[in-house]
């Protein structure tokens, strides 16, 4: 298993903001397993999406923002996003852990458009193009049709901005329903890195779900792994020696810490590769790749 190569506390390394699902696909498709990014959800404003390259595809996992300011992915809850990423550094989502963030592209994101022929007298104004119809839900909302150009007046909230249409009417618009227009610069400079376009909301059923337990992948899915016959715990205790040190994540109370040379009494061998065992009275889960089974009756196997 590859080790993680990122600092979860460095939000700028992995949070990409309002990146569309299609752009996430483009950035991650064909990349190494475990490359990922965190983006804003266009389906549920305020939520996030963890997009990951795994098993020759790109999976998208919804991260719900809870009222108690915690975050939920699958059946797991976390105090903050760095804690969630730390957890999935050593726990598999489906077939991979999180290894490294996707690199930031210096050029404007795919799908962003240039604002043609905008009045030079309004050089400091920010324009957006509407992605589809919005009828308006409240009196303060600004209804619009798909394809309109709007001028942003102010941004009082993260997901709701004040805008003006061509008729001079002002009202609130939902940010996920529009895309920013990147003004072409005569000096050839790119637009602001945060000028990402929002895509049409993706359906809820398009999201993947992480495994409900904390498994490692099956032996067969581990490249280069040899599939050897394993003893059964039904025939009596099975013992193994730790061949790799393991320091569990502080957020995971189910993991078993291991020191090289520890003798582990294996109590269960799950087919997903996450075994259960006991060391000096401590019980928990550990990856089978960290131990080597031996026969207590044969000292030669202890070498």
Curated annotation (Swiss-Prot):
A GO term from the CC aspect: neuromuscular junction
Post-translational modification as stated in the protein's UniProt record: Phosphorylated on tyrosine. Phosphorylation is prominent during early development, but decreases at later embryonic stages and in newborn mice.
Annotated GO MF terms: identical protein binding; phosphotyrosine residue binding; RNA polymerase II-specific DNA-binding transcription factor binding; signaling adaptor activity
Domain SH2 stretches: 14-102
Residue ranges of every copy of the SH3 domain listed in the record: 123-183, 235-296
Residues where Phosphotyrosine is found: 127, 207
Keywords noted in UniProt: Phosphoprotein, Repeat, SH2 domain, SH3 domain
Biological processes per GO annotation: acetylcholine receptor signaling pathway; animal organ morphogenesis; anterior/posterior pattern specification; B cell apoptotic process; blood vessel development; cell chemotaxis; cellular response to interleukin-7; cellular response to transforming growth factor beta stimulus
A Pfam family it matches: SH3_1
Top-level taxonomic group: Eukaryota
Chain positions covered by the region annotation Disordered: 184-203
Family according to the record: Belongs to the CRK family.
Quaternary state and interactors: Interacts with DOCK2 and EPOR. Interacts with phosphorylated CBLB and IRS4. Interacts with INPP5D/SHIP1. Interacts with BCAR1/CAS and NEDD9/HEF1.
Function description: May mediate the transduction of intracellular signals.
Name by which UniProt lists this protein: Crk-like protein
The species this protein was found in: Mus musculus (Mouse)
């Amino acid at each position: 298993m590859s080790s993680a190569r990122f600092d979860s506390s460095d939000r700028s390394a992995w949070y990409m903001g309002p990146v569309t699902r299609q752009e996430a696909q483009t950035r991650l498709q064909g990349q190494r397993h475990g490359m990922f990014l965190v983006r804003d959800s266009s389906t549920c404003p305020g939520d996030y999406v963890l997009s990951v390259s795994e098993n020759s595809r790109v999976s998208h996992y919804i991260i719900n923002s809870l009222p108690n300011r915690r975050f939920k992915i699958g059946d797991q809850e976390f105090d903050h996003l760095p804690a969630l990423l730390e957890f999935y550094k050593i726990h598999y989502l489906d077939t991979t852990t999180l290894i490294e963030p996707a690199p930031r592209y210096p050029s404007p994101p795919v799908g962003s458009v240039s604002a043609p022929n905008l009045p030079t007298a309004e050089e400091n104004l920010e324009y957006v193009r509407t992605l589809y119809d919005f009828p308006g839900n409240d009196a303060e909302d600004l209804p619009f049709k798909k394809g309109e150009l709007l001028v942003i007046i102010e941004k009082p909230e993260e997901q709701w901005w004040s805008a003006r249409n061509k008729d001079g009417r002002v009202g609130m618009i939902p940010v996920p329903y529009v895309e920013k227009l990147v003004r072409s610069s005569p000096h050839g400079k790119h637009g602001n890195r945060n000028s990402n376009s929002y895509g049409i909301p993706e359906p809820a059923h398009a999201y993947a779900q992480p495994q409900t337990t904390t498994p490692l992948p099956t032996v067969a899915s581990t490249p280069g792994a040899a599939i050897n016959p394993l003893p059964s715990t039904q025939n009596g205790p099975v013992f193994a020696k730790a061949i790799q040190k393991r320091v569990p994540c502080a957020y995971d109370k189910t993991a078993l810490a291991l020191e090289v040379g520890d003798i582990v009494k294996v109590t269960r061998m799950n087919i997903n590769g996450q075994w259960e065992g006991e060391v000096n009275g401590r019980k928990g889960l550990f990856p089978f790749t960290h131990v080597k089974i031996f026969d207590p009756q044969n000292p030669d196997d202890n070498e």
